[in-house]
């Protein structure tokens, strides 16, 4: 039972006070006491409950009709349980006595006006506000937790250039659906609210990260006014006569980040505004958490496949687009082609952006994270993807340009995993960087800070700086499976490739040639490859780099060797950095059970590519379908593959992030 300020009583005149129903008011029975008084008793209106608060070790509770001793260890708290119909219509009477058997020496009177003032939000996470439900001030994770949730209003419901969060005026009623409802109860005698005003307030830092709109009903946009936000952190609520509940809508303006935990608080105070008063009568507070941006792994069903139409010295990539169209059709997935006019001949759409989503009990929608690489596709996400119920977020690097590791081919996420006793029901984010405690390239801190601050997909930093491009998608991928594990981790493996070629040599196919079927590319026999000491040395170095990541992934994702599939792949060093010797097969696009895999142009044995056959034998028993696609001229020769040149929006998790415990 929360208590307000103490109300002092007087023997000379009645005291008057305002109380909030359900909230204790401390009554000071000691400030003005008649001479000779030793005991007291308290009575009141039937709508007022009276509580004696005391320490049993110091004060004995009186028996029967006996009075309470005038002892400073005894407090009187009164609680009204009904809203007043008129001013001062509830009474509390304190009588003072010299002894138990004598008449009262004097009486003090307290007249109360009881009001209902509370701020309520969806603490139960049902999508609806329930009055008086649970602890509103504290936000708790987990399936048994509580606390309201805000979405960052980062979509654009009306055509314009920026996200809705930049608007201080409501531009469409649909925008209210992106906001969290909040109800202010202010029931009581109208005359009281002429002098006592509800004041809504946020701290200055919080006011820069949220917006609050007051709703006065109707379908006109003018009925909705922003009352709190970056320009104002306090609002004296305009209560109309007879009004019991006032509706508000709250929007998030910023995602969690290095300097922002994601928690935001709002309070309402009932303030006595009469001259020479300005007394704070009561305060109620609520706490929101801003919904994090969540990535979706390859195990989630695909919804849309994005790919760019480009032209270069080899002509147009129409054949590749046709292959992507066939793959999308098989996977029952929509194909979205970004035309040259919009991509400015930038084909690396995976590097430009990452699809994710935000989720609250009342609303969810996809959000695209625009990378800071800012090349030909730099305007595509903002101008062509941002729209109604499709949000946008980005992080820009200050005072420096983006490195190759800031592209989002260097950003992935695992399926849900369990590591020891720790559950990661939304998986873990994977990013690439330099070898620990060494100099080298890393993803920009501003991006890493953003990813860590989302909390629900705790990032793991891998070692990718050994690659020329430096992206994690060059040596790993995840594929869905129908068994109990639900997925496999695919790792590129030079050792597996050399072992396969050695087996084929021993079977008598040493003269079968890599790159058979490719024009303008020197063919190399299996014998030649196996005899190439430089290639073997490079392969040994690359294998060590991948093996280091393998151990990190096993530890951080709770994987065993049976959860990993080694995909044969050779690399060579160009200077100090590695590049794929033939199209990098782990750099695939995953559309459900259909895998769009870079065609490796491996040695042809008995009419079939031995590399393709090996990969089929590894993956198709898992229920997957391998579709090998030629990306050699338009992607591989430019140090990228199919995954680099495509992007997939996937179905969000059924699991609700607030039920996790980071």
Curated annotation (Swiss-Prot):
In alphabetical order, the GO MF annotations are:
calcium ion binding; protein-arginine deiminase activity
Q: What is the annotated localization of this protein? A: Cytoplasm
Q: What's the source species' lineage?
A: Eukaryota, Metazoa, Chordata, Craniata, Vertebrata
User: Which reactions does this protein catalyse?
Assistant: L-arginyl-[protein] + H2O = L-citrullyl-[protein] + NH4(+)
- Required co-factors: Ca(2+)
Known InterPro entries for this protein?
Cupredoxin (IPR008972), PAD (IPR004303), PAD_C (IPR013530), PAD_central_sf (IPR036556), PAD_N (IPR013732), PAD_N_sf (IPR038685), Prot_Arg_deaminase_cen_dom (IPR013733)
Entry protein name: Protein-arginine deiminase type-1
Residues recorded as binding Ca(2+) 2, renumbered to this chain, are 155, 157, 178, 363
Q: Please give the chief subcellular localization of this protein.
A: cytoplasm
Q: Where is the active site?
A: 644 (nucleophile)
Residues reported to bind Ca(2+) 4:
350, 408, 411
So what EC number does this one have?
Answer: 3.5.3.15
Which residues are the signal sequence here?
none
Q: Which organism is it from?
A: Rattus norvegicus
Q: How does the annotation summarize its subunit structure?
A: Monomer.
Keyword annotations for this protein, in alphabetical order, are:
Calcium, Cytoplasm, Hydrolase, Metal-binding
Q: Which residues form a coiled coil?
A: none
Task: Supply the induction statement.
Answer: Induced by all-trans retinoic acid.
Annotated Ca(2+) 3 binding sites: 352, 370-371, 374
What's a Pfam family this protein contains? PAD
Job description of the protein = Catalyzes the deimination of arginine residues of proteins.
Q: Write out the residues that bind Ca(2+) 1.
A: 153, 155, 157, 164, 175, 178
**Family in the record:** Belongs to the protein arginine deiminase family.
Q: Which GO terms describe its cellular component?
A: cytoplasm; nucleus
Per the record, the gene is Padi1
């Amino acid at each position: 039972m929360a208590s307000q300020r103490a109300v002092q009583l007087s023997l000379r005149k009645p005291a008057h006070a305002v109380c909030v129903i359900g909230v204790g008011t401390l009554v000071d029975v000691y400030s003005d006491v008649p001479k000779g008084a030793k005991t007291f008793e308290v009575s009141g209106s039937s709508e007022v409950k009276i509580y004696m608060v005391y320490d049993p070790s110091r004060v004995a509770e009186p028996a029967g009709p006996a009075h309470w001793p005038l002892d400073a260890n005894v407090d009187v708290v009164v609680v009204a349980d009904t809203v007043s119909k008129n001013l001062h219509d509830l009474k509390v009477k304190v009588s003072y006595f010299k002894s138990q058997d004598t008449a009262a020496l004097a009486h003090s009177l307290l007249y109360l006006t009881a009001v209902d003032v509370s701020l309520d939000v969806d603490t139960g996470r049902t999508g609806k506000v329930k009055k008086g439900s649970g602890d509103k001030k504290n936000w708790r994770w987990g399936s048994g937790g509580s606390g309201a949730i805000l979405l960052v209003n980062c979509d654009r419901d009306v055509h314009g250039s920026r996200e809705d969060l930049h608007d201080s005026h409501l531009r469409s009623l649909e925008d209210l659906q992106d906001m969290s409802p909040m109800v202010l109860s202010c029931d009581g005698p109208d005359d009281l609210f002429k002098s006592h005003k509800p004041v809504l307030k946020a701290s200055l830092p919080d006011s820069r990260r949220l917006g609050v709109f007051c709703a006065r009903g109707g379908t006109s946009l003018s009925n909705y006014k922003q009352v709190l936000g970056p320009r104002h952190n306090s609002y004296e609520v305009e209560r109309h006569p007879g009004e019991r509940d006032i509706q508000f809508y709250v929007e998030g303006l910023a995602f969690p980040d290095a300097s922002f935990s994601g928690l935001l608080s709002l309070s309402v105070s009932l303030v006595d505004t009469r001259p020479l008063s300005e007394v704070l009568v009561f305060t109620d507070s609520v706490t929101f958490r801003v919904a994090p941006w969540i990535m979706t792994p390859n195990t989630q069903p695909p919804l849309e496949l994005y790919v760019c139409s480009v032209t270069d010295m080899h002509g147009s990539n129409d054949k590749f687009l046709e292959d992507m169209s066939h793959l999308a059709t098989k996977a029952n997935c929509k194909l979205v082609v970004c035309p040259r006019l919009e991509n400015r001949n930038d084909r690396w759409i995976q590097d430009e952006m990452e699809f994710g989503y935000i989720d609250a009990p009342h609303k969810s929608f996809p959000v695209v994270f625009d990378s800071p690489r800012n090349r030909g596709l730099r305007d595509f996400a903002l101008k062509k993807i941002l729209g109604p119920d499709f949000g946008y977020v980005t992080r820009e690097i200050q005072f420096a340009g983006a490195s190759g590791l800031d592209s989002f081919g260097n950003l992935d996420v695992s399926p849900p995993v369990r590591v020891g006793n720790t559950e990661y029901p939304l998986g873990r984010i994977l990013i690439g960087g330099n070898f620990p405690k060494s100099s080298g390239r890393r993803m920009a801190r501003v991006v890493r800070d953003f990813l860590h601050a989302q909390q629900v997909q705790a990032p793991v930093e891998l070692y990718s700086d050994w690659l020329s491009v430096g992206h994690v998608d060059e040596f790993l991928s995840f594929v869905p499976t129908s068994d109990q594990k639900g997925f496999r981790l695919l790792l590129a493996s030079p050792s597996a490739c050399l072992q396969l070629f050695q087996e084929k040599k021993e079977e008598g196919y040493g003269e079968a040639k890599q790159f058979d079927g490719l024009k303008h590319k020197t063919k190399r026999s299996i014998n030649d490859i196996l005899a190439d000491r430089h290639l073997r040395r490079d392969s040994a170095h690359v294998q060590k780099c991948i093996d280091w990541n393998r151990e990190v992934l096993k530890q951080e994702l709770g994987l065993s060797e049976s959860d990993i599939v080694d995909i044969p792949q050779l690399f060579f060093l160009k200077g100090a950095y590695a590049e794929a010797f033939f199209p990098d097969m782990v750099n695939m696009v995953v559309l459900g059970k259909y895998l769009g895999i870079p065609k490796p142009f491996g040695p042809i044995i008995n009419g079939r590519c031995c590399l393709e056959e090996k990969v089929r034998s590894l993956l198709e028993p898992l229920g997957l379908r391998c579709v090998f696609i030629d990306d050699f001229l338009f992607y591989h020769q430019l140090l990228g593959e199919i995954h680099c040149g495509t992007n997939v929006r996937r179905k969000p998790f059924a699991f609700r992030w607030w039920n996790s415990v980071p």
